[in-house]
């Protein structure tokens, strides 16, 4: 019987806790972003074979069994109750509040399109503000994807049907 995603994630988080390392420290040791490390340990991203030895060196308690599990394509999903967690709620609120303006600036700078969440990098950093207080910096670094004009002459499935 296959182990559930939440069970594997729980085991992975236990390995992280045992290590005493932060996501940032693990990221430095593996060459990944801190958010990607968290995604790996929560089974929201797939561990690539060439990264596995670096992650195992950073987290020596990672078993070969867990590494193999992490290399399987994950079920990228989330608990629908997660929105109730205050940090996640405020992040969602910020995106909703600034979303229309961000969309307009993307369109102004790039044209009609979107920012990919597939070809995407994300990090969380801590800086001091001008007032000396801690500030959170979230970086979303996604590939620009233009919307395409849907011309039937470019639709491969139709071209194949016409050629038959």
Curated annotation (Swiss-Prot):
Catalytic activity: cyanate + hydrogencarbonate + 3 H(+) = NH4(+) + 2 CO2
GO molecular function, one term: DNA binding
Pfam families assigned: Cyanate_lyase
GO biological process, one term: response to salt stress
Assigned keywords, A-Z: Lyase
SMART domains: Cyanate_lyase
The protein's enzyme class: lyase
Keyword Cell cycle: no
NCBIfam families given in the database record: cynS (TIGR00673)
Record-given protein name: Cyanate hydratase
